[in-house]
């Protein structure tokens, strides 16, 4: 947090520097990254909770001061039906809706939801545009349209063919964020759709298309403009496994731990009758039975812990026993 707050640009958002995650997007010391700004906003929410737990009211008050200011900067990044990607050092917008190329980027949309910043309307609108513009049979593209004629000096992805690598390819790590964002919105059907599209195992019968081993994520997959659409590259060199794990466990399965216990909020395909989880949690064993007789995508109607009805969908650690049986 301190690192980012010490490196703010003209719009009081974190500088993009040499790269913000996207190795081919050089926004510079004065350019700014909306993606990182959302991550910073999220980090502030998390660290404030820990500060309060520790009795550090001074730091919590600091967050209360700077987070709304960052929120104002992020609100200015909303462009009709999407969040922009950021600002160049000269103040020019990257990822504006009117841009002829690279006008829609995945990460700002998914992280606007994950961070908790986007309003309900913004979140629904932005993620619907993600599905409309960026989704493919092989996963969700990093951005669209790819750079061909209208790139700037810091957009190094233009050296790659359209729909390849950072130039409109399907980056595996971002799929976990898209899965999590849709899950947080309660869109179980779409979250699972994104999981299946990008799942290596789901391409078992198309090995000649995917090429990579069916048990490992690659860095990226070529998208629909490529003559090799669906082919994946750069195995064993990506943070995708952990990102998709979070998207599936905390998102689709809805197991969301916090300092006090466990929130249970599944977002599943409406066709599922339910599922069961055996989970070790802080020295306790949890047997969790998720039942979906009404075939909805999300929303907890009732929950019992060891036969006792509890309000809402939160299981306090103080109520957990060595063997805890939970029915949702």
Predicted regions and their residues:
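Solvent-exposed loop and edge beta-strand segments that line ligand/cofactor-binding
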Residues: 24-37, 92-115, 158-175, 180, ...
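Short, small-residue-rich loop/turn micro-motifs
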Residues: 17-20, 42, 307
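Active-site lining segments of carbohydrate-active enzymes
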Residues: 1-30
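Catalytic cores of carbohydrate-active enzymes
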Residues: 39-157, 196, 200-228, 280
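Secondary-structure boundary elements
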Residues: 10, 53, 72, 187-190
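Non-catalytic C-terminal accessory modules of carbohydrate-active enzymes
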Residues: 132-135, 160-165, 177-328
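Short clusters of hydrophobic/aromatic residues that line enzyme substrate/ligand-binding pockets
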Residues: 13-16, 83-84, 143, 217, ...
């Amino acid at each position: 947090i301190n690192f980012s707050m010490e490196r703010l640009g003209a719009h009081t958002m974190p500088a993009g520097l040499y790269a913000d995650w996207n190795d081919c997007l050089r926004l510079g010391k004065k350019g700014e990254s909306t993606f990182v700004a959302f991550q910073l906003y999220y980090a502030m929410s998390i660290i404030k909770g820990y500060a309060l737990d520790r009795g550090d009211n001074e730091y919590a008050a600091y967050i209360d001061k700077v987070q709304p200011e960052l929120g104002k900067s992020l609100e200015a990044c909303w462009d009709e039906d999407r969040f922009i990607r950021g600002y160049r050092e000269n103040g020019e917008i990257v990822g504006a809706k009117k841009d002829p190329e690279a006008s829609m980027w995945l990460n700002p949309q998914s992280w606007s939801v994950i961070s908790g910043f986007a309003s309900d309307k913004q979140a629904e609108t932005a993620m619907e545009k993600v599905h409309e513009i960026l989704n493919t049979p092989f996963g969700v593209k990093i951005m669209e349209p790819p750079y061909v004629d209208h790139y700037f000096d810091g957009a190094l992805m233009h050296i790659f063919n359209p729909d390849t690598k950072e130039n409109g390819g399907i980056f595996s790590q971002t799929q976990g964020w898209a899965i999590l964002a849709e899950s947080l919105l309660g869109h179980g059907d779409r979250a699972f759709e994104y999981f299946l599209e990008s799942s290596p195992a789901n391409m078992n019968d198309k090995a000649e298309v995917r090429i990579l081993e069916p048990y490992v994520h690659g860095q990226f997959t070529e998208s629909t403009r490529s003559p090799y659409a669906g082919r994946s590259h750069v195995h064993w060199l990506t943070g995708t496994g952990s990102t998709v794990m979070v998207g599936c466990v905390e998102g689709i399965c809805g197991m969301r731990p916090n300092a006090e216990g466990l929130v249970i909020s599944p977002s599943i395909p409406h066709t599922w009758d339910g599922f069961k989880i055996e989970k070790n949690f802080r020295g306790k064993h949890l047997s969790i039975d998720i039942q979906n007789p009404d075939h909805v995508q999300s929303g907890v109607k009732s929950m019992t812990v060891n036969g006792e009805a509890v309000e809402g969908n939160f299981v306090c650690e103080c109520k957990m026993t060595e063997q805890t049986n939970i029915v949702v």
